[in-house]
Structure formats: C-alpha cells, structure tokens
C-alpha cells in the first residue's frame, strides 16, 4: 500500500524499484558484474495532465557515473517544450497542452570532458482531467535488499558490496511527516525475525532523528523538511540483526542527497559599487566588476546568476553608455563620448537573477553602481590676459613682481589642472622664476637674482603655461597658453663700493707721519643721481692713518712699525667708510691692507737672560741664543762677542755654535757663590748692521746632585731705584692715613662735647616713655613759671618735686654730668615783657579765629565710603521744627523749652 508522497518524492526514491521490475536486478548491481555508467532505466514514464505550466517539474531521470565524479550535462530532444536541469529533473519549458506527438522525447547525457554520449526515452502518459493521483509520474517506493548466495557446500558467502545509487530528496518538502523514502529488507526475513536500524549523521548522530527506520518493516523515512544550505547530503548505514542482536547481514551504505530548490535570492556583496573610468575612453574599456552570490547550488540553475543593467542616470551622450557581461558581472563601456566636463558621474542599477536569468521563475536582486568619470588633461590652461605688468626695486630678491592667472576646465587640484609656468624668452641671465600657488593655481613671478637699474630698467618676459601631465593625444595648446610679462625696475639709492676691495699695498716700515700712502676711492653705482661721496675712517687699530674726506687720499699719522702688536704676518688692516649724499644716505666699506717690509730697526738680545750654575759647573758651558724682532736678512746669523770690561769678564769666553746660537764657557774651575752679570755684545746681519750689549744674569749656587740647593748672598747688588721709591710711597701713605684717623677722632670728640653742652637735661627725652594724659592747670601759653626763665641756673633739683608729679619723659634721677656754666641769662624783665607783648598782640588780633569757633572746611567731593559726618543740619526757619516734646522733659529743661518752643516770654 502506498501512502501519499510529495510531488517529486516517488521519482527520487524509485531508482531500484524500476530495476526490480526488470529481469535480474541482482545482476545489475551485484554478483560478478561491475557498475555500468549510464541511465538506470531504458525508458522513463511519467503520468501528467495534458495542460502543463512553464517550469512545472514532470519527472526525474536517474544517471549513475559509478562514483567516478563525471561532469554530466543534460539536454532534451525537444528543448522548446521540455528542459532538464543538472539533477535530471525534467521541466516544462513553456505553458502548453501536450499533444500525443509531444508525449515522447529523448533525454541526452554527455560527459563534458570525454564528450561520451548516452540517451534514454521518456514517455508521458496523459491523464484524464478528473483523475487525482498522488503519485503523478512516479513509481512505487524503492526496495533495497540485503542479498546473499549459497555455494555448493551449503556455506554462505557474502556477495560483493552493492553500489547503491544515491537517494535524492528535495529540500523544503511540504506535506505530512514522516515521509517514507525507501524500504530496507533482507532475504532472510522469511526464516528469521529481523530488526532493522540505521546509523550515522541524521540518524543516531547530530542532527539526531532526521531519518528513522521501521525496525520490523525496514521503511526509512524523513521526519522534517531538509535544507540543502545547511547539509547537502547524509551518509547512513543500514543494519539487519536478529532478535538476539546478532548481525545477519553486512551493513550497507545509503547516501541521501538533498536536492536544491530555488529558495535563495541573489545577494550583492555591496549594495553600492564605486568605479571610475577616464573621460574619453574608447568603447569596450573595462570599468569594474560587480558580484552577487546565491545560497543555492552554484552548479545548478538555482544558483546560476545572470546580470543586466536596468537603468542609467543620466542618459547623456548615450542612453546605453555601459554594458555588463551577464555571467561575470564585468561592466565595460559601450559607447564613446565620456566627457567629465559634461557628466562627472553615472549611476547604474544592476540586477542579478538566478535560474540563469529566467525572468519568470528566477529570483532577482538589485544594486547600484556609481561610475565616476575621472579627468584627463584634455583642456590646456589659458591665461586670463595677454600681458601682465609688474615692478620691482633694484637689488631686491625673493620679491613677487606679478601674478599670472589662468583658467583650466579640468578638475581642480589634479595633475591635469595644476599649472606649470615656464619663462621661454626675455630672461637670458636667469633673474626671474615662476612659482605656482597650490591653492589658486596662479603663477608668481619672482626675482631670484639682483637686478641693476643702471644695467637694465625694463624686462619683457615671454611665459607659457602647461600642466603637470601632458595633453592627451589630439589636443593642442592654444595661443591663450602664452603671455607676456612686463617688469619695470625702480631705481633706488645703492651703496657706494670701493674698488678694489680689499686693496693691498706694500710699504717699508719706519715711514714717518704725514707721508702719503695711497688713494682709496669708491664709486657710486647710481650714476644717474649725480651724488657726491665722502670718506671717513672706520677702523684703524694703531691709529696710524687718516683719509681725506673728499678724495680718499690716505696719509700716515705715526711711524709704521712692522713689529707692532697690531701687525699680523707683516700685514696691517684698516677699514674705511664711503657715504653718498642720497636721501637716505648709503654707505659702503673698504679694507686697506698694508704689507710692511722689514728694515733693520731692532737690535738683537740674548736669551735666556738668567741662568743658574753650580760653583763647580760640569760641564762649564752655557748655551745662549740671540733673538731679533726683525726678520731675514736683518736678523741672523749673529756675531757674539765679550767686551773687555769688567775685569772678571776674562773668566769667560763665548763661542758661536750656529747663526743664532752660541756657547758661554767658564775658563776657571769654580766660582764663588753669587750673581754675575755677564755682558754679551751681539751684532745682526742687517745692512747697516745693528748691535747690542745685553747682560746674562748668572747665579752661582751650591749644588746637590747637580741642582742648586742654597742661594749665595747677592754680590754687588742692591735695591733698584724703583723699588726704593715704591717703599717710600707706601710709608708716606700709611702715615697719612694714621694722621687723618687721629684728626677725625679728635674732631668727633669735640662735636660730641658741643652737643652735650647744648642739650638741656629737662629736654633730653631719649628713649623714655612719654606720658601725655596730664590735663588741667589752665592754658599752657599763660600758665608758665617765669622764675625758670629768669634764673635757669638756680632751678631746683628733681628731688624736691612731689612724688607723682615728675613726667615720664624726664631723665631718671641720678648723677648728671657736670657741664660748663652758661653765661648769665638776660634780665628777667626783658623776657617777661617780650612774652606779655606777644600774648597781648595775639589776643587783640581780629583776624585770628577763636579756638571755639565753627571751623569751615573745603569741599572734598561726595561718595565717601565713610558716609557723611554732618547728620545734624540747621533749619532754614524756626517753623520747620517742632520742639513741643521739650516740655515733657521736666522742670530742669523748662528754660530750654522756652528758648525753642517759640514762647513770647
């Protein structure tokens, strides 16, 4: 009994069922015969209704390659009506009614590598319209047997393993589950009670329970829809055991392939694709590749994609500017006319469709391709003017004299737009250069070498503008790419300059003052300004020279001396200044170098000038050298001689060793301790020669191990005049300082005594604490003790004052120093009259304000942070105040109340 199956299931599971209907199925797959490549049936049958729809599956033809993994391609003999996919499923190519003539056709299978060809016949049985059969076009469920064979001895031997064709199950199957796929049985089930089972992924391994088997009947079923994108195939093993669990058959392998269905829509890797192409590209130029993927089997039509362009925006130059390879997704140009100046960007809508691009039953998706038209140098730069003007002061460098402006239609800030300027004429000496401003693309004409107005006052430059990249082929430069620059040089006051500078002259030393040396003159480059030049001395270290301010004549002011400290390597340098009369005046410097020729003006002298020898010298000779400030030929070789005096000079002799060296030898064996001054007469080789007698100071000392240990007393020596004068000056200065100190001390004592005589003991406050809280006793200007003024020398001592009366600022009571008695005071009457007259005059003075009068202060402004101190103001009239409250103060204030109450009394 057959249960209802999905529409393709019986066909996919009927591989062996068809074989078992034929004679000897075992011979086809078992026994000694090997697997044969080809269709599993000679004729395939399908039962369908007359009317079919495009894409409707009709049946499945099975082809086996015996596991050799051949690449098989299928085709029908009537592709107009029927087509076949890579899994062997036959579909209707169009919607039509099948005629009897169309009900039979051939299916071809060809090896793509060897081109070997197989074919099989397909016969379609037309069903009546009222018939409803759940197994349309399919056979009954396949049955797979565990087959054995007995030999002549009655022993069983296992047959060779079967090659079981795969079981194909479509994914996403609908219907009632579980759905039976195949039946597994053994020939021994007639005699034994067997139990069947399956193992492997999908059965007892994850995912567990996808496939189940009836342990008694052997029906293998699938329990749920399959998804090829998750698992494309399952490898199971079928087992047969008896009720005791003993294996009665060897396991057989079962492969279940999940047949792909078109359940995945193509997906582009990017929703927006960006590409670029240079403008002016020829048709057929590659732009970019767009790619989409499909989750379905890429080897089947479900996963085979086809591309096409749905739209192009904008449709300028050509509505079909681009095309796409429908299989690879390569976008190429189809038409000419790409111009960035017209269209900078194209937007394409790309569609990818599976089922090999079938628009009816294929799934599709879209993406956007943005193609930027990149710039090429197809527009030369053009100057905005034919002539540009500029001016520059002479002798200025790194100055921009003119701005050159150009226009370029190419894309800004690209090599095709960036301008490069060149000077092609009018600047033979290379005094100008043109730099490009990176932002504005302007050309900056710059002076790179000084320009002399007196040499050339106007420059006419010819310049051209180009780009960083060459123009594309076929584009020529225009006349507007060349321009003229007129540069005017402005005359400025320039520095005078000496020529030659430095100036070298040769002169013998010893030239006296007021002698002319040379003329050192300067020139003014501003020959059109008619200016005068004046000269002055800038540097003359030895102050030997002066220069005439008008004509530059240099004369000496002192004797030139080659041996001066200011002369280096016989050369003396002086610097002079030349200043013109321009506004502002400009100046330049020049150096005069005087090479001084030597004359014999320096006598030679002995070196060293002091030596030490032992009293018994060994050797008894002293090496000496003659030095001369002059140079050859006015120096060596020298002549060394000893004079005839003093007498002890006879103990010595001198012998010349070379032109500059000699040896002073002692004729006797020893000398007494002391210091000996040996005169040596030396003559140079100058013409005329110069000679000099210099003294060699020889110190004779006691020696230990050939070194002096003690110094002998000085013989015939004493203090020099300079030393004696210095000692006397020191003594005089010391005595003067002592005398000045004594005088200052005496004067200070006298001043101290004079101060003590003038100080009154009563007024000597010093550092005592003053007490100022005594009040009363009348006015101090009237209450005074006249007796103190009359006889100050007879005032009472402090001891007779009452206790508590003595002021704190008075001296404490102790013995006071005795001072000389002052002269007698004037007559007391005179002092009293003087004081009384002054007091009377003060009292009668009408201009003197009384102490209790209202003081008037100057107005110092408002806004004091301390506020106003005059909070009580006088009323302008008596009626403005109410003084009735004074009557409530009692009888004591009655008089005050009467005064302010306005009473008539």
UniProtKB/Swiss-Prot annotation:
Residues 161-723 are extracellular. It is a single-pass type I membrane protein. GO terms for cellular component: adherens junction; apical part of cell; catenin complex; cell surface; cell-cell junction; cytoplasm; desmosome; intercalated disc. Residues 29-160 form a propeptide. GO terms for molecular function: beta-catenin binding; cadherin binding; calcium ion binding. It is found in: Cell membrane; Cell membrane, Sarcolemma; Cell junction; Cell surface. Residues 161-268, 269-383, 384-498, 499-604, 605-713 form the Cadherin domain. Pfam families: CADH_Y-type_LIR, Cadherin, Cadherin_pro. Residues 746-905 are cytoplasmic. Residues 775-784 have a biased composition (Acidic residues). Residues 1-28 form the signal peptide. PANTHER family: CADHERIN-2 (PTHR24027:SF79), CADHERIN-23 (PTHR24027). This is Cadherin-2B. The gene is cdh2-b.
């Amino acid at each position: 009994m057959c249960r209802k199956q999905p529409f393709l299931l019986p066909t996919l599971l009927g591989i062996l069922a068809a074989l078992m209907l034929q004679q000897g199925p075992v011979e086809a797959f078992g026994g000694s015969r090997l697997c044969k490549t080809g269709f599993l049936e000679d004729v395939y049958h399908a039962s369908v209704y007359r009317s079919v729809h495009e894409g409707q599956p009709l049946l499945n033809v099975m082809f086996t390659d015996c596991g050799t993994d051949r690449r098989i391609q299928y085709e029908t003999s009537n592709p107009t009506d029927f087509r076949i996919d890579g899994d062997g499923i036959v579909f209707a190519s169009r919607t039509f009614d099948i005629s009897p003539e169309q009900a039979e056709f051939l299916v071809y299978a060809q090896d793509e590598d060897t081109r070997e060809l197989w074919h099989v016949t397909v016969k379609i049985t037309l069903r009546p319209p009222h018939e409803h059969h759940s197994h349309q076009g399919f056979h009954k469920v396949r049955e797979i047997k565990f087959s054995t064979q007995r030999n002549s001895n009655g022993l069983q031997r296992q047959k060779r393993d079967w090659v079981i064709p795969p079981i194909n199950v479509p994914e996403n199957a609908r219907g009632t589950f579980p759905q039976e796929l195949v039946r597994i049985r053994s020939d021994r089930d007639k005699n034994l009670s067997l139990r069947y089972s399956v193992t492997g992924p999908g059965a007892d391994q994850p995912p567990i329970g996808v496939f189940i088997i009836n342990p008694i009947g052997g029906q293998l079923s699938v329990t749920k829809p399959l998804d090829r994108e998750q698992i494309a195939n399952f490898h199971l093993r079928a087992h047969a055991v008896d009720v005791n669990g003993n294996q009665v058959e060897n396991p057989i392998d079962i492969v279940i392939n999940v047949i792909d269905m078109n359940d995945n829509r193509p997906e582009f890797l990017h929703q927006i694709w960006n590409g670029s192409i240079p403008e002016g590209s020829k048709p057929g130029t590659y732009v970019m590749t767009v790619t989409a993927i499909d989750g379905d089997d890429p080897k089947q039509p479900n996963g085979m994609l086809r591309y096409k362009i749905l739209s192009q925006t904008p449709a300028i130059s050509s509505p079909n500017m681009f095309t796409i390879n429908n299989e690879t997704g390569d976008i190429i140009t189809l038409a000419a006319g790409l111009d960035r100046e017209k269209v900078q960007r194209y937007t394409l809508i790309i569609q990818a469709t599976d089922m090999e691009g079938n628009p009816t039953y294929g799934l599709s998706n879209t993406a956007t391709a943005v193609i930027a038209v990149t710039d090429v140098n197809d527009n030369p730069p053009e100057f905005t003017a034919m002539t540009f003007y500029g001016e520059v002061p002479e002798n200025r460098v790194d100055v921009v004299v003119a701005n050159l402006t150009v226009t370029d239609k190419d894309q800004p800030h690209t090599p095709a737009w960036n301008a490069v300027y060149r000077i092609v004429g009018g600047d033979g000496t290379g005094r100008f250069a043109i730099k490009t401003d990176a932002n504005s693309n302007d050309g900056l004409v710059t002076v790179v070498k000084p320009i002399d107005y007196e040499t050339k006052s106007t420059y006419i430059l010819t310049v051209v503008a180009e780009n960083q990249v060459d123009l594309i082929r076929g584009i020529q430069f225009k006349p507007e790419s060349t321009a003229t620059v007129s540069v005017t040089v402005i005359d400025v006051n320039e520095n005078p300059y000496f020529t030659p500078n430095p100036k070298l002259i040769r002169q013998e030393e010893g030239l006296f003052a007021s002698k002319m040396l040379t003329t050192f003159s300067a020139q003014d480059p501003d020959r059109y300004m008619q200016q005068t030049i004046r000269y002055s001395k800038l540097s003359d270290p030895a102050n030997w020279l002066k220069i005439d301010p008008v004509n530059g004549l240099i004369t000496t002011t002192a004797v030139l001396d080659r041996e001066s400290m200011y002369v280096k390597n016989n050369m003396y340098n002086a610097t002079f200044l030349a200043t013109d009369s321009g506004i502002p005046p400009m100046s330049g410097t020049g150096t005069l170098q005087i090479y001084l020729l030597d004359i014999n003006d320096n006598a030679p002298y002995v070196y060293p000038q002091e030596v030490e020898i032992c009293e018994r010298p060994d050797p008894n000779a002293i090496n000496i050298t003659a030095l001369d400030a002059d140079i050859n030929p006015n120096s060596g070789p020298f002549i060394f001689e000893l004079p005839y005096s003093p007498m002890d000079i006879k103990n010595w002799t001198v012998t010349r060793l070379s032109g500059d060296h000699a040896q002073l030898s002692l004729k006797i064996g020893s000398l007494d301790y002391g210091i000996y001054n040996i005169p040596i007469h030396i003559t140079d080789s100058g013409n005329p020669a110069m000679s000099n007698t210099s003294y060699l100071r020889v110190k004779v000392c006691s020696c230990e191990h050939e070194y002096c240990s003690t110094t002998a007393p000085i013989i015939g020596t004493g203090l020099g005049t300079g030393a004696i004068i210095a000692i006397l000056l020191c003594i005089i200065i010391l005595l003067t300082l002592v005398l000045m100190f004594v005088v200052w001390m005496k004067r200070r004592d006298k001043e101290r005594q004079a101060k003590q005589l003038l100080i009154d003991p009563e007024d000597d406050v010093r550092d005592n604490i003053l007490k100022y809280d005594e009040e009363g006793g009348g006015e101090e200007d009237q209450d005074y003790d006249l007796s103190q003024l009359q006889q100050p020398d007879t005032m009472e001592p402090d001891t007779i004052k009452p206790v508590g009366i003595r002021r704190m600022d008075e001296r404490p009571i102790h013995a006071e120093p005795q001072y000389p008695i002052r002269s007698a005071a004037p007559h007391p009457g005179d002092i009293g009259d003087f004081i009384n007259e002054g007091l009377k005059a003060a009292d009668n003075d009408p201009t003197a304000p009384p102490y209790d009068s209202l003081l008037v202060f100057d107005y110092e402004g408002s806004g004091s942070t301390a506020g106003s101190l005059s909070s009580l103001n006088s009323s302008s009239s008596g009626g403005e105040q109410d003084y009735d409250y004074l009557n409530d103060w009692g009888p004591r204030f009655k008089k005050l109340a009467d005064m302010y109450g306005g009473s008539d009394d």
